[in-house]
Amino acid sequence: MRVRKLSDCYKNLSNKNYPIFLLGDAKDILKNIEDNSVDFIITSPPYDNLRDYKGFCFNFEEIAIEIFRILKNGGVMVWIVGDSVINGSESLSSFKQAIYFKEIGFKIHDTMIYQKNNFSNPSKTRYHQIFEYMFVISKGNPKTFNPLIDRKNIYAGYTSLGENTTRKRDGSFTKQKKRVIKEFGMRYNIWKGNTSGQENMCKSIKHPATFPLWLAKDHIKSWSNEGDIVLDPFMGSGTTAVACKELNRKFIGCDIEASYLEFAKERIK
């Protein structure tokens, strides 16, 4: 498996051999991908000054426009991002990016939270920061949603309490039958779990900011189907690639740092 260079042309993605690893700047690489060709995007971009990316920075607005162009109608992107504290104030870069996505035509389908089980860089003047935003952004209405039914109901086995009603268009109500509460319900939009640092306590993931495999897999399962094309424009150490291999998705990833791509290739062997 080779790391392919920007000079390669990526048209007609349905006929390619996957996974595809692309070396170069995301804004340049995405311009070589055809319109309306990607089913799902998940990524955690370098934000503010929190990540050492070998001195590189990225042009958010150009990349956002290219993402809108290449994502299929009904496609979804999960944009995992946080904010740094600059001169005593949070940057709010995450919200500025979400607003820009909406301005160029996306829908902000959901604002989810990734709550970590641990924290780093504790502050003496504010509570420990243990979450990142996960903006679920769609091009039109999402065409795919496979909800994860793994939240344990504390009232499982009981008959639903009270009398449920459905309001009709004319304002009247229709009574609904009582039901037995199932053991598991749909997950909430705050996802709590181990960070990749905890997952890989005894491993060496050669990247400054990986997100955990379970997080990538759960989003891929939720917003795409087997055989779909999944893109990570800031793939880093290749966690999304590993998830796609395990879940039978067609992966495309790019990164500006060659060492990250080489390490990602090793992870999926």
Question: Can you say where each PLM-predicted feature lies in the sequence?
Answer:
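Core catalytic lobe of class I
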Residues: 1-263
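PRPP-dependent phosphoribosyltransferase catalytic core
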Residues: 266-269
